[in-house]
Amino acid sequence: MSTVLFWFRNDLRLHDQPALRAALTSGATHLLPVVCLPAPDERTPWGFARVGAHRRAFTSAALRGLQRQMSALGNPLLICQAPPATALPQLAQAVGATTVVCEDIAAPYEQAEVAALRAAGLQVRTVWQSSLLPPARMPWPVDQLPGVFTSFRQKVERAGITPATPMLMPTQLLPPPDVPATVLQAVGAEQGAASIQLPAPPQGSDTRSSFPYGTPGCDGSEAAALAHLAQYLARKLPHSYKDTRNGLTGLHYSSKFSPWLATGALSPRQIDADLKAFERDHGANDGTYWLWFELLWRDYF
């Protein structure tokens, strides 16, 4: 028996999950899927809350959805109320694991989290998957990124760089290992996470809100994200995107993909693939191009 830990970060989904695929095909016989919640009172070095109430509630909805999906596949998500540097080494030791697989994130705080795990003796395999286009396919070294977006876009278009085909959701997972109750208690977790108190979204919404995340259509889960993408395309809203995208209030002036992209409940490559299919079926115009343009803008910044 061998176990690999999969650490969910800003990738709270099962569709188009190269990092999860890497864990499932690592040769391990068992999989322990883990997410670590930041403490409610955690502060940045500048004294601000690291995660605000609205983001915490929206992310919690994503986690509830992920719980349901993974439980249906026979391997419930382990939600820990302890930082990764505390929780993951304890869990790894308890189940005899030496390797953690996770999403690669190019940010100092997140890189420091990975460094702490390696310093604790764990092997950490990181997989880049958050952008539309992989940095490795760019026609320049990472340290020679064009200084302005327009140059970046033009070079990408001239080079004909296209996103990878998004991966399908797994239809099965490796079985979970047994984790001693004492270890679960030490990392503030219960397998299946039924007793973890996740913040609830607000009930109802202000009619002026451009993203009322307390309503079913704006739920934080992967299922809601994919349903939103499907209805957005079914209503042919990409054709009018460029004309309406700079509105300030209401639900339908822009794509509203950003909140789900931020938590990773929606993959940019899935958006691109579905948008390309939409263009084949209904035609391309400035609006559909501008949606792709904005995904590329997200990559650059």
Region roles according to the model:
Residues 143-301:
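Glycine/tryptophan-enriched, flexible segments
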